[in-house]
Amino acid sequence: PANGVEKNQFLAKQALDLGCYGVVFPHISSVEEAYNAVAACRYARLKDKPLYEPQGIRGDGPMQACRYWGITQQEYYQRADVWPLAPHGEILTVIQIEDTMGIKNLRDILKNVPGIGAILIGEGDLSQELGYPRQTEHPVVLEAMAEIVAICKEMNVVVGHPHVEVSNAQR
């Protein structure tokens, strides 16, 4: 989908309605943007039901996803929720942290937005903002990426890196 601030929920809906098992939301920098990302992946539910927040805003229309998943629509509605918020959920909401504001707010995001399945480090844009474009081995960039990893470990959230090589796999 588009960047986090653009709130183009329809792009997440389209991907999920085609049968994708998750969506990566780039440039998430605030609690509000992260909440919108998770909400875009969830169907609405009654307020008195468990796991209400974040309130789902995904529109209906999963016929192709049901065919792709090989299940009925009713089964799809049961399983098409975000993991780990819904233990039975099979949709993964991944947010990409790509700037210093995202790093600054990451702890609050993970504390206040249930349903984020993983964090993906956006090293290219992060290195650009830090003044070292595509210098992903620069100490300043490495320090920023290490901070993301440390926060994710502290908050017990999976963190990923898009360009894993033998030389950086342990990071």
List each language-model region with its residue ranges:
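Expand to "…catalyze enediolate/carbanion chemistry for C-C bond making/breaking, isomerization
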Residues: 1-171
